[in-house]
A protein has these predicted regions:
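Glycine-rich, small/hydroxylated-residue low-complexity segments
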Residues: 101, 185-187, 191, 202-204, ...
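Terminal hydrophobic membrane-targeting helix
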Residues: 16-116, 387, 555
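Secondary-structure transition motifs
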Residues: 68-173, 274-331, 453-480
Length: 604
């Protein structure tokens, strides 16, 4: 046992002595020129190492350096600039003149992917004739890297003249194998426009076709987005992504993604081809797509609820907005297909939602924008031409949509319920609720079935006004607090916030009405004039009851939507009805009592 222990001690001493001798005899600065040459030959980038290289023996044999930078040819700024670098090397390969790096560690690095860091040629260079490549000169050293680690670093990303994006607190680990499969573990965060996104992911990169193509399989990704314009709890989720990046032509493809976002689930694929005109393709499926939770939209509350809407601060953008409207549409081509089993928007639940459309450099066509709300259905195809005026044109077809659900979406007071059907053509220059109610124009045929006017009983207003002025008739003792109209229809014209409804007619078992109305949507005011015939509820003198059932009473409703005033012209209506009745009876009496005209005499 003592001999074995002595042997082990001797081996350790020999090993330590050999390592010490190797480190002493091999100068790490001998690798400087070789590493610079290898990096430039393999990547085209230029490696710069400031200061002396030095050994670090414990706990891992490493080469330490000072400031490190990697630059593209002719670039104004380096792509990578790090405070220090550590190369963890293997001991035994050094004996055979092979520098095998187990890990590259960069700390405090700044990575710039900006126009200033891109390669630039000083002048057009002649193109050499094709031929066999010149073999690399023999060298006693070989250079391999198995792992790269980046800690506490920053990435500056910028495309063209777009604002730069700073990605901070980067912690990245990359491990490669012989088949050029790279395992990646990354965590980072970035802040933009008062919004903070933190994320972490684990992925496998297929580098077999690098640099022309890189494929990625992200097995897990988790994220959290917080800040202005978002719900108080933010947006968070997990998922998986599978895709690839192609260098020439530059194209990003996500073959499949599955992400959760709060209580929403997103599945689909997308691709982006970058060039003079960018081209995007998106296919999205979702079992539930809650836009209220994703976009921080407050649920609209009715005027009678007395509740406050949730106020969500909007972000203050850190860069100037483009003065050219729809610039993104002008410079791109896109195709979009979205299917959601359930979509939530401003508290409104839409089933079987479908969106299909395309953009051809500013000319947008939406062939399908449809869904179900309650028992109703809507389909709103349309077009958008950013070079024309009006910009947007839609052809809505609504069938039996619940009014009580739609009114809060447009921030209109409650008080109406029924099933809205509409068909028409509308156009405008902006896509927003405010623009729709203040700038849009168009016309439509409108019909509302099972209409209910809450807190207003038209039959009660008319009958009680008549009873106060005529003791020959009576009215019911009890009334409901609403008016039910079986069906109401009209022709509507919208003109910059002014809604004019003509040929307005409605009927129910208790009454019929005809008239027209004007609505000021921005001011939320209206002025409606109707002639109403009350067919039920009259009691008393039969002749008076018959007269009242056949008499149209003028009724005017006017004022703010939530505080309507009314004006009844009962006397005028009855007086006109009695005058017409007297004229009719006088005419009938005259015809009956007029002497017969004598026949003309005939000549013999």
């Amino acid at each position: 046992m003592r001999r074995l222990f002595t042997t082990l001690v001797i081996l350790l001493v020999v090993l330590a002595a050999g390592m010490t001798a190797l480190v002493v005899l091999i100068n790490p600065n001998d690798f400087r020129a070789y590493m610079v040459r290898q990096v430039e030959m393999r990547t085209g980038y230029r490696l710069s190492l400031d200061g002396e290289l030095r050994w670090h023996v414990w706990p891992q044999l490493s080469i330490l350096s000072g400031n490190v930078s990697v630059s593209a040819p002719g670039a104004a700024t380096p792509v990578i600039n790090a405070e220090n670098m550590r190369l963890d090397v293997k001991l035994w390969p050094l004996l055979s003149h092979k520098l095998e790096v187990k890990q590259v560690m960069l700390k405090g690095a700044v990575i710039r992917l900006t126009p200033d860091s891109e390669a630039r040629l000083a002048s057009p260079a002649p193109i050499a004739p094709t031929g066999p490549s010149v073999p690399e000169a023999d060298t006693p050293w070989h250079f391999d890297i198995n792992q790269v680690e980046v800690a506490d670093s920053v990435l500056v990303f910028q495309r063209g003249n777009a604002p730069a994006l700073n990605v901070r607190d980067i912690n990245l680990t990359m491990r490669s194998d012989a088949s050029r499969q790279v395992q990646v573990s990354l965590s980072s965060r970035f802040n933009r426009d008062q919004r903070d996104l933190s994320f972490s992911l684990d992925a496998v990169l297929d580098m077999q076709n690098y640099p022309q193509q890189v494929a990625a399989d992200v097995s897990s990704i988790s994220y959290q987005l917080q800040g202005a314009g978002l719900p108080a709890e933010g947006i968070s989720g997990k998922g998986t992504i599978r895709g690839s990046y192609q260098r020439q032509p530059e194209k990003l493809t996500v073959n499949q993604f599955a992400l959760s976002a709060n209580n929403s689930q997103l599945n689909g694929a997308l691709s982006a081809t970058f060039g003079t005109v960018a081209e995007y393709v998106l296919t999205l499926q979702s079992e539930k797509l809650d836009l209220d939770a994703l976009l921080g939209l407050a649920h609209a509350t009715s005027s009678g609820d007395g509740g406050d809407k949730t106020v969500i601060a909007q972000p203050v953008f850190s860069h100037d907005q483009s003065p050219e409207p729809y610039q993104g549409l002008r410079n791109s081509i896109a195709r979009v297909a979205v299917n959601a089993a359930t979509l939530v928007y401003h508290g409104m639940t839409v089933k079987a939602f479908v969106l299909k459309g395309s953009n051809q450099r500013g000319k947008v066509s939406v062939t399908d924008f449809s869904g179900q709300i309650g028992e109703g259905h809507f389909a709103i195809p349309g077009t958008m031409d950013v070079y024309a005026s009006p910009v947007v044109s839609i052809q809505p077809t609504l069938t039996a949509l619940p009014l009580a659900t739609l009114l809060p979406v447009f921030e209109l007071p409650d008080g109406l319920d029924g099933k809205l059907s509409l068909q028409g053509r509308l156009s405008g220059n902006e896509l927003s609720r405010q623009a729709f109610i203040s700038q849009w124009r168009g016309s439509a045929s409108v019909q509302v079935d099972q209409l209910r006017l809450s807190s207003l009983n038209i039959q009660q207003l008319i009958q009680q006004a008549v009873v106060r002025n005529n003791s020959s008739v009576r009215a019911p003792d009890d009334y409901s607090r609403y008016t039910d109209i079986q069906q109401m229809s009209g022709e509507a014209t919208l003109n910059a916030g002014k809604l004019d409804v003509q040929s307005l007619s409605g009927q129910s078992a208790a009454l019929t009405l005809e008239g027209d109305g004007q609505f000021d949507l921005p001011a939320q005011r209206c002025d409606i004039n109707m002639n109403v015939r009350v067919k039920q509820g009259w009691k008393g003198d039969d002749q008076w009851v018959q007269v009242l059932q056949d008499t149209a009473i003028p009724l005017r409703l006017y004022g703010e939507f939530g505080n309507l005033n009314y004006q009844l012209q009962v006397d005028q209506g009855l007086r006109k009805r009695l005058q017409d009745e007297m004229k009719k009876r006088l005419s009938d009496w005259t015809e009956k009592n007029q002497p017969a005209a004598k026949a003309p005499a005939t000549n013999p």
